[in-house]
Amino acid sequence: MKEMTGLHSLVSIENFIKQHKFSFIYISRPGCTVCHAVLPQLRIVLDQFPNIKLGHINADDVAEVAGRFSVFTVPVLLLFIDGTEFLREARFVHFEQLEQKLKRVYRLYEGE
């Protein structure tokens, strides 16, 4: 399963995004049952993409994340490429569609 880095402040989030060409940010809350169901599936999908780094944010611990990333519900899945948000999914995630989008983007940017 994909390794995941816990991010506990806006500074650590910004640094994570800057440090990796492909940064995937997963935002959740402990009491969110959908979040608990989505995370294992997400980690399995991301296993196919070795250069995508996964970071996790607990929105209860980093309240500023809502304003910084316009988060109105959880879970939120954000893909950043070279520091720019490229993909966003929220609440109910269609994993087949997400996987296809990731494959297209990954091939395009890995071919550079």
From Swiss-Prot:
**Ranges for the Thioredoxin domain?**
1-107
User: Any keyword ATP-binding?
Assistant: no
Disulfide-bonded cysteines: 32-35
Keywords from the UniProt entry: Disulfide bond, Redox-active center
| SUPFAM superfamilies (UniProt xref) | Thioredoxin-like (SSF52833)
Q: Record's superkingdom?
A: Bacteria
What protein is this chain from?
Thioredoxin-like protein YdfQ
Organism equals Bacillus subtilis (strain 168)
